[in-house]
Amino acid sequence: MTATRSPDEVQHGAAPVPGGPDPVRRTPLSRLVPSSTNPWTGRGAFVAFAVVVLAFPSLAGNSADARLWAEWLCYAMIAVGLDIAWGYGGMLALGQGLFFGLGAYAMGMHLSLEQVPDGTLPSFMSLYSNYTELPLLWRPFQSFWSTAVLAILVPTLMAGVLGLLVFKRRIRGPFFAILTQATAVIFVLLLVGNLKLTSGTNGLTGFTTIFGRNKYQPGTNRWLYTVAAIGLLVVLAVAMKVVRSRYGKLLQATRDSEDRVRFLGYDPAIVKTVGFMIAAAMAGLAGAIAAPVFGIVSPAQFDYVPSILMVCWVAVGGRGTLWGAVLGALVVNWARVTVSAARPDDWLYLQGLLFVVVLAFAPGGIAGLLRSRSQWLTALVARKRSPIEGTSLEGAV
């Protein structure tokens, strides 16, 4: 006969059953994070999205459209990672441009070396420096595979170091946001100040060939779009796995109450640092793919202003919903291009107004509005199908 305990004994940490596990360690995370059946994270939605995204190049009107959408898909990757940090972990990071820039510069350095014969320096080094051989910093980027690894590994490790330093000191909220923003500014200043190594404000340009393909060859933009689409699908799949895992529940519990998580025997600083590292890795991957898509890698692309815009994408789409982050990035950037083409001077005002309206009237973002509408329609259908007017389905059964 198995001994049992009441729910109160489990919740309040009563003495363990002889031979049983420690109740503090075994307290289910579901008590801290309510379970939900969220259609936005379903596998069916992922498969449908994958089919549409991968089929888009054949539907695009021209190659330029494919390149533009490839850029937006890279932004969506950043938004998904930021949603894990902010939406699920409660870490408002205003410096994701730092990790995006690290990935982009890593791939940009490789592409710069691809444009010149082996043993030859990039053109800007010959102009701004007296180097006679390739600097040590640039040598790992001669190989594509080492570049691909470093584009993800360097941002991840930097986020790990920064996260431990910050979260171990229990810095959070606006202080964490300001610190991450300051870190992004420092990164940009380093890029601008090292003219001999990074080409300063000019950035890395002149990518006429991309991984052996002519940049202006028909089909190159569609090929880059396919790479960006696969990258986004990988990021989404990983993100879904993370948020559904035990760690994902722990991350959400940390967001809601660090003290409770600490009582369960976990270190909130480690939990948050891992989430921050995941977001940085996704931003680094996005940057590595974005470099050939942009055709230029410049410090202005990774300053504090783009970092703030990344937060706007997640807020507009709906933080705490991965699909909302993707939707927000795509919708906001589509609106930017559309409005800027018609009224180039008005977009910044409209963007600010959009952000204010969302925060004031739709804090759940687009995804929250769609979810509430879906729930309202479901309830309406349930009432109409109920045999007794005003009775729910559960009461009718």
Region roles according to the model:
Residues 2-397:
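Transmembrane alpha-helices and adjacent helix-loop boundaries
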